[in-house]
Amino acid sequence: MKTKNILKSVVGCVVASAALASCNVDPEFYTQVTPETFYTSQEAVYQRYARPFTHWRWYAGHNENLWRLQELGTDEFMLPTRGSDWFDGGNYQKLHHHEYTDDMTCISEGWKLSQMGTALAWDALEDLEEVNFDKLGFPEGTRESMLTQLQSLVSYFYLKGLDLFGGMPLYTTTRSDIQPRATDEQTFAFIDSLLTVSLKGLPVKQELGAKETGSINAAAAATMKAQLYFNAKSYIRKEMWSECAAICQDIIDGKYGKYALDPDWTNIFGFNNETSPEIIWSVPSENAKLETDGMHWSDMVPYNYRNYLGSVENSGSNNAVGLMPSLDPTGKPYTSKLGRVYSKFNDKDIRKQNYVYLGDGKYRGMFIVGKLQNPLNPEWVCLGSREYKGQIINEVDQVAYFTRVKNDLYKKADGSYMYNSVADLPSTIATAEENSGVRVTKVSPRPTQEDKKLMFNPDVPIIRLAEVYYMLAECKMRLGDKAGAATLINTVRKRYFENGNDPNPVTAANLDKYRMLDEWQQEFVAEARRRTDLVRWDAYVTEDWWDHKATNNTNFNRFPIHYSVLEANQKLKQNPGYGRD
């Protein structure tokens, strides 16, 4: 019988079978059956192989914590206190103001889930290495494909950990003793080496528009390698624009498989997006099977929004996040260079419409804004539940206590009104109402009740070809070729305008730091990457935006390690700038 040293979680969490590779306890030994006696069928092998991918699916496509770490605290999204809703101990206000502490749950999850992912992948790989694939009748190359994909999955989790926290404890087996944190450079090199090996064994997509299933192919690994080089300045203080550009050009040229920009943006996120030629890697989702909406639906939309879609079932909403406002309470535009997300979309951009499901899996618009009365079925309305209870909600690109103006419930001690006009209203992360902020319904759109069987059919894109175009564009810009950068960005932008007539294309003359950041934002809004882009441009801690003053503390470019993680593995060191007195 084989014995395996199953290491407990660094955060003390949990599940004995998770095989986490960071802990501060003596190894515990469990008796386990050998692969030869347990993995006696192809089904059993596939189940073992799939376990780390189910964790990846949760981490990347369903759990809200990774999304919140990447989007809240940036100039893109807010999770404001809405009256009595969403204060939650002030945690979301802390994220907004970069007041990070080592006891925040989302930060704990960011570390824990990435470490768990690497452990699960190595554990599965070790088991499958001992399986006789030929004896079980697998097609030639199946073993190599599975093992290489699991190694690539390890790279993904370490890349996320490096991005959020810096150097990580590095493991190549679940049988290892607990490790301290490696340096940033060591972690970077380790990820790079894993991806270099993976690229030699991963399958290359042969058919344009072939169905994506969540498996890792060569283009996904190549893009991860490009992402690593693209952010090398942030990770290891070394510029690698030329190296990143070379990989991006190879991906676009088809070296790693057949992909193409999708001319219809709704195909990328829509109800049959597994066949979009732009998708390189995505989290699968399907009605009544592996369902996920990436938390985008429930957290993004207002209360009762399901009624705007004909009372579509299984569509409760939390009325949480919204875009940073573009307008102050009086309607005057803010002037900060960053933020103001909705207002920066050109009015002729076909995405800048209220979301309307048209039927048969078709829809228009990416936003939830204005009076929420369905234009195709006017009796379908979204009514308020808090300040605007019983009224049709009007989502505004502002944040303020509008219902408190000259309201008898809000008076000072001398009997005068607390707010005599909208000009008196504060606009902060702590002073929102239920209709504050434009919402984005981009990832995992919903049908109406009539087409309820399409619900959850959209996959959650993780990597798409447009990102490769934008990485190459920024690399060209950084290397002095602004005209080449503009051409690449405009190649993507044209699909958002009728007949490709872009009224404000990128040019060599108008492309600067802020235009580049705006282009990243408009193309990838809500796709859990904004923090990384701001850090790469040295803007995350140095720029102001709505209700946020720059800290100018570069330590905050990384999150602290949760105190429970440090207690569980005392070989780990806290990131600079954090700690307890």
Per-region residue spans from a language model:
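Sec-dependent bacterial lipoprotein signal peptides
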Residues: 1-21
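Long, intrinsically disordered, low-complexity segments
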Residues: 21-25, 29, 78, 86-88, ...
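An aromatic- and glycine-enriched ligand-binding surface/loop that stacks and positions planar moieties
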Residues: 24-87, 199, 219-410
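Conserved, well-structured interaction surfaces
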Residues: 39-50, 54-60, 83-165, 178-189, ...
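C-terminal substrate/ligand-recognition segments
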Residues: 104-108, 358, 362-490
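Short coil/turn linking the two alpha-helices of tandem helical-hairpin repeats
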Residues: 160-164, 169, 231-237, 480
